[in-house]
């Protein structure tokens, strides 16, 4: 037995082992198979390759084996890597020189080429070349390989030919060999095809190119428009500069000042240096590259400006050339639209696409893992079951018993052998060990220990931060000692934790591993220092690792800990992106070396630091372009290296543009996507932990209250939840949801009068609410609650009932008083801006001083009044208890103090004057919307705390490392030849270029760099400027040149040190700064959703519902006059649109041909073409005016825009012609012969007239903007643009206030600094006037050279000659506060406000990357446009029959699309279920709302009436001001027996169903059965239950399957189903009968005239037999039709009397088919109604008090049957069948049951009375049984999926 069981067990184990081996083998084979498939692109190998090699060919077999051999792949990757190294080592030299290394590398190139060619050949033989799936060239990466190999071979062939022909190799015999060899740099791209993770990133980038197409188009379009505007405005303006008279030497004041344009007259820069003149002949700024002389250069300049790099230089040059009156408008709008909006669109689209792609790949990975786990579980489960059955378990249990006995005997013998005392001590030691570990564990977990560790960390930080340049020896030794002590503390902490938790548990935590690493490195550092093994540099870097201990702080701060953890996790996701970024940089660096290597050597200029002379330098240069800092200057050098702007060298700008666009716009924005992803993850982590902590607290509470009753416990839990919601409520007021900043969040977009939406008249609390959703601004401004007089007395004099106090109360709370105070605040703000900062004694300042007294008096009176009313500060509710009132008090107090002190030189008075700038802040307390925004911003700043802290920690760490590396090493002597401070004394001679005086004497000075690392604070400031990408190359090159402490720089001394800066930029600038943007976006989205978290609608649903509720129909003017109609028809046709589009494009090309110094022929041609286009566009305007008349024409904003452009263009043409005619007399403004008086004046006047004429020439350019209206994609982007600005009113106001305050402070503090050319405070950039100050701040906000502005504003700068400085105080202007001033402004602007703008754009641009099949607000405008064609007068109603055709003209997801069958359309209408008016019309809002509701599945499930009520409640809660009338229109309330489209079209489906039922009967019997028995009724009832009900059910719930419907419709067409007469539309005359009226004419009256042609086309598209059409009823020609549609009662009676004729007309009607359009277009559509406008559908009756009948009157009671009579038994059976089908609500509708009864009777060919008798018999037989039987399963046709209808479903 034992052996048997043992054998069984062994057999089971062996079987399990063999099974696992088989499984492993199977998996291995599957992997190999998958790899082979991947190698061939997922396709099987072709049977033949190159038409010759079959699969069995031994040579091909060998090729396949080699290619699919893993080492082969590794060899190729290594070869690519080696090739990259060879390319990097290559040293390009000027003038095509070379050296031995380069020659060796050239010969190595042949080896690489042979290897790559061989690989290519083997793969082509293995997989075939091109003509079948899986061929070599069918894979994109292989195409890249093939091109690279081909170009290499081609280069080799050309080289060989040249060598044979004796042509020098490099000249290439006509071929540019350098260009061909440049293809070699693409070889690193082959690494992408070898690394799968790179392929994923690359593929997702390529995939995201699609949504970027429209944005790229918009960017190009915007650049083109601004370029042509620049061409018109600034052409030929930048070629004059100041020359010394009689020479070609350009005059500049300082050696470092760049030459600038000048103006001979007018407002431009004058030449002020003695002996200089302003004349033409200068190539222009940047070697003649930056100008607007032709469209290409203008586009390059505009592109450079929208990258915000050197845009102010271009603006200042234009100002110098033309004056600074208006060019700033051009550049500011360019930056706002181009840089802040359009480039952020790129960011939004990219990040959305990447997030989507990452989400998809994550989902795919999770799904794959789940499948594998399920498969493994299934295999294991099956096999374990098999083993369990095979094994005999008893044997195992016996074996275990034997084993236990053996163990016991062994332990007994052990006890006997060992001494008892040893055992005792061993046990005692173990016990003590357990006790000590437990105590140690408690100690380590205690708060005291945590605080001790934190204290040690902070001390460690302080010791490191104390280090600085020129520190004392004592401090150094103290730091060394402290380091050892602190290291010992950290070592003790580590050992204690390791002992308390055990090594395994200790190393489970990532933070503990991190601690261990830091401590180990610290110990290693001390050992190396003591033993003098390592260099000091290495030691200093290792010391900095101690700084990582700072992150120990985060473990005690949960949310910060989670943030750090998520950032560490994101390193994995960043790795592949960084690899791609590195590959991208390497490729462009290698390409740059090929194109620019050794060419950046210009004889007349200093050495260019950013160059491509070697690989490390090329990498740095490419990285610099990638960050966007001074990328334009590198581009200019590249252009000059290839011959300058006049040669084809200008084409190298393409290299830099592609590098900038791909690197900066695309790759760097992916960091943002990753940042947003990981932030969301950190947020969810924190939320989950919060939830966990609350749960723990709740459990603890319950445990502490065991004796309390259940009710008390519930009450306590409720209180806990309330306290939680309050705690959470306050932070969530950080509503970065910008809708909150609108004048009203939900009503702002309503363009209609508010009469339709009466507001709820409740009083609104104006203070910030505690609830998660702040009140909308309009609500806050509707009515302010008046604060009553407090019970306490004020000033101990005025009691609560005192008359004076009551009077003051009335005054203070009066609206007029508030408005007056706001007006005075505005006036005082204007007076502050109008002050002259230079001369305090100027007349203007004296006048403003008196005004200041008036303002101060008014504000003082206001405060006194308020204190009188509310009391000063002693009691609750008093004036000083409000923080905003304290602000008011401070501002007024400051004004009073500054009035009392006279001298402006006293620093206290200066400060007090500066503090007056806070006056505008007083407006915040009065404008409630603005107050709310400010409060939200403060809370938002609190929420960013964690990110700021992490960034500051990192910045601090890098600053400490910087101090270790660079302290005292960035000093230099002004004489570059001297290297130490001792040598740097005395004077030296300096040659001045471009000067008449060749040599100048300068004083030697030993100076420090402006941004240095001498201490931690300086280091943090330097690093912060680097993180903003401003001026970092300058700091980098100073660091590279740094030598030793207190020693001057050596050129390229430490190139490797650049790694420090690059790592810092990647970690901080690329990643952490994007985290800021990401955090604002995440907070914005989270808070936006938070406010609606309980309303059950997501954001998209809310936007669409809001649109549907607020939209109003558009008026569509259609002329009555036939001639005018023809013009209108032509103007509204698409051909006219295409013609105008073509003309605008032609006009664009014609505008682009202009250039500076163009010939007279070009000028004449340009003017002639302009005249022609002006005539054409004037013609367009006239034609449109004829078509639409003035009212209709000017109703469209685009037409108004056209009109302005045409008028401006006509003025332009007239002025140009007049000016040309008067040219001989000096032009337009010199009619009185000013040329004779003063030639310079003539030039000035001529320039002025050019400006005037040029202004009107702008109208030519503005025509291009009309193109924006032509493209759907660009229209959508414009929609985003408008939406973004719509969301910014109060935020915009906040930005204006911020700029105003900072501008006025800047004027007071830096206004006296002298304007010195060559510095950053100069004639174009200063604080001397308010507009200049605002422009300077705007420059700082864009980040343009802002660190240099700080340096130019620091204390010790030269004062302006007009200012009131004393003797010897010439250099006392500026202020040390400049650092704080500019830093705070830059941080507020760049990181908060501009990011807020980015967040809004990203929120509005999400539709670009969203699934296009999801309905969004941008789809809904189309509905309004097409509705207008059916309802030109904008009545808001159309016939319900028009709805089908209207919706078929709108493409999905909003409409049905033109290919949607009518039957499917009718079923969609059932689910839409709009209320139907008595005249057969539906309303605009109800239809749009129903479309939105069904498309987005808003409350369409479950009981329909209940869903309606829930939706009504949601709408009331979100859109409180929606009128009840509108709400009843879109969602009828319960209890109203409304006629709805759903009920109406439900009868269609019942009728269609019975027609099919009859057809089946005919097919079954071959004829209409005459046998009448109960089985027939049962069959009909069964068909209702099993066929009609499920179909209706699906239609009601909107669960339609389009393909299924299409198939059924086609089947119906093939079976030849004919439309039977009778029905729902009442009496219709045959449209093809011999009636004199034409269907065409009637259509023209009932429908938009444009549609009378299109209707027939739709009929052709949808074959009549395949489409479900309404049934029509025909009568003999001699039957008179009813014309009095106004008397519907008679009409019903008349119809009832004719009911008997129906069967007679059956056979005749069944032989004809009529289209839906024929019916709705026929003149007899409503029973012969003569007036279409007054007609009523015959399907409706006038409502009476007795009854209303919603359906066709012919289904109503006949003459012999009163309205109250019925067929109870039949009705009962039909109701039962409907209920069994899940249509309870239809079963309750007597009218619907009546319709169904009649249809059933007709279908089984039986009279009503007979059917009732049989039905009664069925009911009698069923009596005593359960009435509601179990539903039978619905038979499903083969090959289709069964859709089981839900129980208890909704009503229609």
Swiss-Prot record:
One of its GO terms (molecular function) is voltage-gated calcium channel activity. Glycans are attached at residues 99, 102, 274, 470, 1157. It is found in: Membrane. IV repeats lie at residues 1121-1405. Keywords: Calcium, Calcium channel, Calcium transport, Disulfide bond, Glycoprotein, Ion channel, Ion transport, Membrane, Metal-binding, Phosphoprotein, Repeat, Transmembrane, Transmembrane helix, Transport, Voltage-gated channel. Multisubunit complex consisting of alpha-1, alpha-2, beta and delta subunits in a 1:1:1:1 ratio. The channel activity is directed by the pore-forming and voltage-sensitive alpha-1 subunit. In many cases, this subunit is sufficient to generate voltage-sensitive calcium channel activity. The auxiliary subunits beta and alpha-2/delta linked by a disulfide bridge regulate the channel activity. An additional gamma subunit is present only in skeletal muscle L-type channel. This is Dihydropyridine-sensitive L-type skeletal muscle calcium channel subunit alpha-1. It comes from Cyprinus carpio (Common carp).
């Amino acid at each position: 037995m034992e052996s048997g069981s043992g054998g069984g067990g062994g057999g089971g184990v062996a079987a399990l082992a063999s099974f696992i081996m088989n499984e492993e083998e199977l998996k291995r084979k599957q992997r190999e198979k998958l790899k082979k498939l991947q190698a061939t692109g997922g396709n099987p190998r072709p049977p033949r390759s190159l038409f010759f090699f079959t699969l069995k060919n031994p040579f091909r077999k060998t090729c396949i084996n080699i290619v699919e051999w893993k080492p082969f792949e590794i060899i190729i990757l290594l070869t690519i890597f080696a090739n990259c190294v060879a390319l990097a080592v290559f040293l390009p030299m000027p003038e095509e020189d070379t050296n031995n290394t380069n020659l060796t590398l050239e010969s190595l190139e042949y080896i690489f080429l042979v290897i790559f060619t061989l690989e290519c050949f083997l793969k082509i033989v293995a997989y075939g070349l091109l003509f079948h799936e899986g061929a070599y060239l069918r894979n994109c990466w292989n195409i890249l390989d093939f091109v690279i190999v081909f170009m290499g071979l081609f280069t080799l062939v050309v080289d060989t030919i040249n060598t044979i022909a004796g042509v020098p190799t490099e000249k290439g015999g006509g071929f540019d060999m350098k260009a061909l060899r440049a293809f070699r740099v693409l070889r690193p791209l082959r690494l992408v095809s070898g690394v799968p993770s790179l392929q994923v990133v690359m593929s997702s980038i390529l995939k995201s190119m699609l949504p970027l197409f429209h944005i790229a188009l918009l960017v190009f379009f915007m650049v083109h428009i601004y370029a042509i505007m620049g061409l018109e405005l600034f052409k030929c303006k930048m070629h004059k500069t100041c020359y010394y008279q009689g020479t070609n030497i350009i005059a500049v004041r300082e050696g470092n000042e760049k030459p600038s344009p000048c103006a001979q007259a007018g407002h431009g820069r004058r030449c002020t240096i003695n002996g200089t003149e302003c004349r033409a002949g200068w190539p222009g700024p940047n070697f003649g590259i930056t100008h607007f002389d032709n469209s290409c250069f203008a586009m390059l300049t505009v592109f450079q400006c929208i990258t915000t790099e050197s845009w102010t230089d271009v603006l200042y040059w234009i100002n110098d050339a033309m004056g600074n009156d208006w060019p700033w408008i051009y550049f500011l709008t360019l930056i706002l639209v181009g840089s802040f909006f359009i480039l952020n669109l790129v960011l939004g689209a990219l990040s959305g696409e990447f997030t989507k792609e990452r989400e998809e790949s994550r989902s795919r990975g999770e799904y794959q893992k789940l499948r594998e786990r399920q498969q493994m579980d299934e295999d294991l489960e099956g096999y374990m079951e098999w083993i369990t059955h095979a094994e005999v378990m008893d044997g195992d249990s016996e074996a275990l018993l034997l084993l236990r006995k053996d163990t016991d005997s062994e332990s007994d013998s052990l006890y006997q052998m060992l001494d008892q005392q040893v055992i005792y001590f061993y046990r005692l030691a173990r016990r003590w060990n357990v006790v000590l570990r437990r105590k140690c564990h408690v100690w380590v977990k205690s708060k005291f220990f945590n605080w001790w560790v934190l204290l040690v960390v902070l001390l460690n930080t302080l010791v490191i931060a104390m280090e600085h340049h020129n520190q004392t020896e004592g401090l150094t030794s103290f730091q060394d000692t402290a380091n050892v002590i602190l290291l010992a503390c950290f070592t003790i902490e580590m050992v204690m934790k390791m002992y308390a938790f055990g090594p395994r548990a200790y190393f489970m935590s990532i933070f503990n591993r991190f601690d261990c690493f830091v401590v180990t490195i610290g110990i290693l550092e001390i050992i190396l220092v003591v033993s003098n093994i390592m260099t000091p540099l290495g030691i200093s870097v290792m010391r900095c690792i101690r700084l990582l201990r700072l992150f120990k702080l985060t473990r005690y701060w949960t949310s910060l800990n989670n943030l750090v953890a998520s950032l560490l996790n994101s390193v994995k996701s960043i790795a592949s992106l960084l690899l791609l970024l590195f590959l991208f940089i390497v490729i462009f660096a290698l390409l740059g070396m090929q194109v620019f290597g050794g060419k950046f050597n210009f004889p007349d200029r200093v050495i260019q630091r950013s160059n491509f002379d070697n690989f490390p330098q090329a990498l740095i240069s490419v990285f610099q372009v990638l960050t966007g800092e001074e990328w334009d200057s590198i581009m200019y050098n590249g252009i000059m290296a290839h011959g300058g702007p006049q040669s084809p060298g200008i084409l190298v700008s393409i290299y830099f543009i592609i590098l900038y666009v791909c690197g900066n716009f695309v790759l760097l924005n992916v960091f943002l996507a990753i940042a947003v992803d990981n932030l969301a993850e950190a947020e969810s982590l924190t939320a989950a932990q919060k939830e966990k902590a609350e749960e723990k607290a709740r459990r603890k509470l319950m445990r502490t209250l065991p004796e309390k009753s259940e009710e008390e416990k519930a009450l306590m839990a409720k209180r806990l939840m309330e306290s939680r919601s309050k705690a959470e409520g306050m932070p969530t007021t950080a509503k970065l949801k910008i809708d909150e900043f609108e004048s009203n969040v939900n009503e702002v977009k309503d363009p209609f009068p508010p009469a339709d939406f009466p507001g709820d008249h409740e009083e609104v609390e104006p203070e910030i609410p505690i609830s998660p959703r702040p009140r909308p601004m309009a609500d806050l401004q509707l009515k302010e609650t008046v604060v009553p007089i407090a019970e306490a007395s004020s000033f101990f004099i005025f009691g609560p009932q005192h008359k004076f106090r009551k009077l003051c109360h009335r005054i203070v709370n009066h609206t007029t008083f508030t408005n007056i105070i706001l007006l005075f605040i505005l006036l005082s703000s204007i007076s502050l801006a109008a002050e002259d900062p230079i001369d305090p004694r100027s007349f203007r300042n004296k006048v403003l001083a008196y005004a200041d007294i008036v303002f101060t008096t008014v504000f003082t009176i206001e405060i006194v009044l308020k204190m009188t009313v509310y009391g000063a500060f002693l009691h609750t509710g008093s004036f000083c208890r409000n923080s905003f009132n304290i602000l008011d008090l401070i501002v007024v107090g400051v004004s009073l103090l500054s009035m009392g002190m006279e001298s402006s030189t006293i620093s206290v008075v200066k400060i007090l004057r500066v503090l007056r700038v806070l006056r505008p802040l007083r407006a915040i307390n009065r404008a409630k919307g603005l107050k709310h925004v400010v409060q939200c911003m403060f809370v938002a700043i609190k929420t960013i705390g964690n990110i700021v802290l992490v960034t500051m920690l990192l910045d601090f760490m890098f600053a400490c490392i910087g101090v270790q590396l660079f302290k005292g090493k960035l000093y230099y002597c002004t004489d570059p030849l001297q290297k130490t401070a001792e040598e740097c004394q005395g004077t030296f001679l300096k040659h001045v270029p471009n000067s008449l005086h060749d040599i100048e004497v300068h004083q030697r000075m030993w100076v420090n760099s402006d941004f240095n690392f001498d201490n931690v604070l300086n280091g943090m400031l330097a690093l912060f400027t680097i993180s903003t990408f401003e001026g970092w190359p300058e700091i980098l090159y100073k660091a590279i040149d740094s030598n030793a402490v207190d020693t001057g720089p050596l050129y390229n001394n430490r190139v490797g040190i650049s790694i420090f800066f690059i790592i810092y930029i990647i970690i901080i600038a690329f990643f952490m700064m994007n985290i800021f943007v990401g955090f604002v976006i995440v907070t914005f989205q989270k808070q936006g959703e938070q406010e609606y978290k309980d309303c059950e609608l997501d954001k998209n649903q809310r936007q669409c519902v809001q649109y549907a509720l607020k939209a109003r129909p558009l008026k569509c003017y259609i002329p009555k006059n036939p001639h005018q109609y023809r013009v209108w028809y032509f103007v509204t046709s698409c051909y006219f649109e295409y013609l105008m589009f073509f003309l605008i494009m032609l006009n664009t090309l014609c505008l682009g041909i202009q250039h500076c110094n163009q010939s007279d022929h070009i000028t004449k041609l340009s003017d002639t073409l302009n005249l022609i286009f002006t005539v054409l566009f004037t013609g367009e305007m006239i034609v449109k005016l004829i078509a639409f008349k003035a009212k209709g024409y000017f109703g469209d904003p685009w037409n108004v825009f056209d009109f302005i452009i045409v008028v401006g263009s006509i003025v332009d043409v007239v002025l140009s012609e007049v000016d040309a005619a008067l040219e001989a007399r000096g032009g337009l403004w010199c009619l009185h012969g000013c040329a004779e008086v003063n030639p310079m004046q003539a030039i000035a006047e001529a320039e002025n007239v050019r400006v005037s004429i040029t202004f009107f020439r702008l109208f030519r350019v503005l025509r291009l903007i009309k193109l924006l209206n032509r493209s759907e994609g660009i229209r959508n982007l414009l929609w985003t643009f408008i939406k973004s600005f719509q969301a910014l009113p109060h935020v915009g106001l906040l930005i204006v206030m911020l700029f105003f305050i900072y501008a006025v402070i800047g004027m007071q503090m830096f206004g006296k600094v002298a304007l010195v050319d060559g510095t950053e405070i100069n004639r174009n950039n200063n604080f001397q006037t308010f507009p200049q100050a605002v422009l300077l701040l705007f420059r700082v906000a864009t980040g343009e050279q802002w660190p240099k502005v700080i340096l130019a504003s620091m204390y010790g700068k030269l004062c302006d000659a007009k200012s009131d400085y004393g003797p010897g105080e010439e250099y006392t202007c500026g202020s040390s506060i400049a650092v704080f001033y500019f830093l705070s402004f830059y941080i507020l602007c760049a990181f908060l406000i501009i990011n807020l703008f980015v967040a809004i754009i990203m929120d509005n641009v999400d539709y670009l990357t969203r699934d296009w099949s999801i309905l969004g607000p941008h789809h809904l405008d189309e509905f309004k446009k097409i509705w207008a064609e059916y309802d030109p007068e904008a009545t808001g109603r159309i016939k319900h029959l028009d709805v089908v055709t209207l919706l078929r003209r709108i493409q999905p997801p909003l409409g049905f699309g033109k290919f949607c069958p009518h039957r499917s359309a009718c079923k969609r209408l059932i689910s839409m279920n709009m209320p139907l008016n008595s005249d057969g019309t539906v309303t605009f809002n109800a239809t749009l709302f129903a479309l939105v509701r069904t498309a987005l599945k808003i409350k369409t499930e479950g009981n329909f009436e209940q869903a309606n009520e829930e939706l009504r409640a949601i709408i009331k809660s979100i859109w409180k001001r929606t009128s009840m009338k509108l709400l009843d229109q879109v969602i009828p309330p319960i209890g109203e027996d409304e006629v709805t489209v759903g009920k109406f079209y439900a009868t269609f489906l019942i009728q269609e169903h019975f027609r099919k039922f009859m057809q089946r009967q005919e097919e079954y019997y071959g004829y209409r059965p005459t046998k009448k028995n109960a089985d027939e009724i049962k069959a009909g009832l069964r068909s209702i239950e099993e066929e009609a009900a499920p179909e209706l059910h699906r239609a009601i719930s909107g669960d339609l399957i389009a393909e299924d419907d299409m198939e059924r419709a086609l089947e119906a067409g093939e079976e030849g189903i004919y439309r039977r007469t009778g029905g729902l539309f009442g009496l219709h005359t045959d449209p093809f009968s011999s009636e004199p009226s034409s269907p065409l004419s009637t259509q023209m009256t009932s429908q938009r005239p444009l549609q009378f042609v299109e209707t027939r086309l739709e009929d052709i598209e949808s074959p009549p037999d395949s489409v479900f059409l309404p049934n029509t009823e025909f009568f003999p020609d001699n039957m008179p039709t009813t014309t009095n549609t106004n008397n519907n009662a008679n009409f019903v009676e008349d119809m009832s009397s004719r009911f008997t004729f129906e069967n007679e007309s059956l056979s005749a009607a069944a032989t004809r088919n009529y289209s839906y359009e024929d019916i709705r277009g026929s003149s007899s559509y409503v029973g012969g109604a003569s007036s279409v406008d007054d007609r009523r559908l015959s399907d409706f009756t006038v409502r009476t008090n007795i009854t209303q009948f919603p359906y066709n009157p012919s289904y109503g009671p006949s003459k012999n049957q009163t309205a109250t009579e019925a067929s109870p038994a039949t009705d009962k059976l039909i109701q039962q069948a409907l209920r069994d089908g899940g249509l309870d609500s239809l079963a309750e509708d007597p009218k619907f049951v009546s319709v169904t009864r009649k249809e059933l009777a007709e279908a089984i060919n039986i009279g009503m009375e007979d059917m009732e008798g049989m039905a009664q018999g069925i009911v009698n037989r069923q009596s005593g049984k359960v009435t509601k039987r179990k539903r039978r399963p619905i038979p499903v046709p083969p090959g289709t999926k069964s859709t089981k209808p839900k129980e208890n479903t909704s009503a229609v």
